[in-house]
Amino acid sequence: MSLVLSHRTALELYRSSIMPLSGFVRVPFESLSVPTSDDVAFYRSLPIRTAHFPLHCVVSEPKNRRNVKGGRCHVLGADMKAIRLRQSNEGSLLCVVSPEVLFLQMAAQLSLIELVRLGYELCGSYSLPMAQPNYAGTPRGFSRRSPLTSVAKLNAHIVQQGNNRNVKNARVALRYVVDGAASPRETELCMLMVFPRKMGGYGLGVPSIRHKRVMSADSAFRLTSGCRSFSLCWREAGIAVAYADKASAGENELPKRRRRRCDAADYETVSSIDISSRDIRRVENLDRVADLVARGHGRYLRRDMQYDFASRQTALRDQVLNSM
């Protein structure tokens, strides 16, 4: 028999240090066990703090749901792909649903913006902290790891499902997810760029994310030695937005467009716009960046919209920049 952890429990485990990134097994839904108090106790004995969030697991049919203290059952009447976490001496498995199944499950519980942010995390090389605050009551910073899945894999899994509300929500969210984000800052910038105008974003289309570690002073990037930088590249428009965690631009200097080679490995010259974290936080600076990118696509960002774009932009920025 198999106890398969799901939903918020699976997400917290993926954010922990004990979660293996290999060992996928096919779990027949007939083998899903009915959770017992012993299962909950075994889960609570894992070497991470689990007391602050409930145990979510999947069962094969509604009659197998149980009112277990500290547990919650969800029905998933189909075979699934899961990662084997532990195996008992009796041969029973403790598994965690795959990232693809997790994304679809969370589509029923998260808002669109939250689901897109989760997609960036699953398809990126970073994890947000578990839901256990430090002494100040604030979650700790993100950690590095290999990507758990990709946009292509998430889409492939969704295609195999029915046409319920979860699938529709997940399909919409994946329109705005990009592979390869390595930090929450990259996710923030990319989300603001790709969300449509009606949501308060810039509607600039989905870019690719490229990374570069600068080993010496680089006047083109305006970086100091050892800074990590990334670029959002719109290849079809021949333009990129280059970000670095350190910059020496003047306090009131707006981002500028310059012509240079974006990546030596690509052998292509693009127009690059250098920005810093301060530019992302200042709406007028990021408006300037978005306008330059839009011109690279041969269009202008309209201001005379039928709806109040300024208020929607403020609401979106508040959710994206202040909710990590």
Please provide the spans of the model-predicted regions.
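Short gly/ser-rich loop at a beta-strand->alpha-helix junction or flexible surface loop bordering the NTP-binding
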Residues: 1-166, 190, 298-301, 305, ...
